[in-house]
């Protein structure tokens, strides 16, 4: 049984539907606020990665998911570069339970988008003539589980305080 047949069989059994309609760059920014002086310094940067995800319901079973990355490279107190990417996708997700939908929007879809965002960051850093930057993989499943634990703890704390 080939992979397409297996996927079709799995979808028929569960009734769940998942389709990538489109992946696109929603917003991009690259800044080198301390150039050209920063190019004269020894390249020993501290690289910081911030990421965030959000989703919007566009239609019944159609969602936009946006993965926002901010990469900041600093040498001492000076910012070498600041790169911001919003990588987005439009996904069809139907016939799934609410908890499964939340996981797909908060972890599965960002996993799909991350390689595109990572490539965009790498290309922008390269065009800025900085040494190559390859972002490490991100475990969105673990981040989503941590987020859900925080929400549960906050809800429990709110009920205790009430």
Swiss-Prot record:
Annotated disulfide bonds: none
InterPro entries per UniProt: SecB, SecB-like_sf
Chief site of localization: cytoplasm
Listed GO CC annotations: cytoplasm
One Pfam family recorded for the sequence: SecB
Alphabetical UniProt keywords: Chaperone, Cytoplasm, Protein transport, Translocation, Transport
UniProt key word Transport: yes
Keyword Transport assigned: yes
GO MF annotations, alphabetized: unfolded protein binding
GO BP of this protein: protein folding; protein tetramerization; protein transport
Localization in the cell: Cytoplasm
Family stated for the protein in its record: Belongs to the SecB family.
Function statement: One of the proteins required for the normal export of preproteins out of the cell cytoplasm. It is a molecular chaperone that binds to a subset of precursor proteins, maintaining them in a translocation-competent state. It also specifically binds to its receptor SecA.
Subunit field text: Homotetramer, a dimer of dimers. One homotetramer interacts with 1 SecA dimer.
HAMAP family: SecB
Protein's recorded name: Protein-export protein SecB
Organism: Pseudoalteromonas translucida (strain TAC 125)
Encoding gene per record: secB
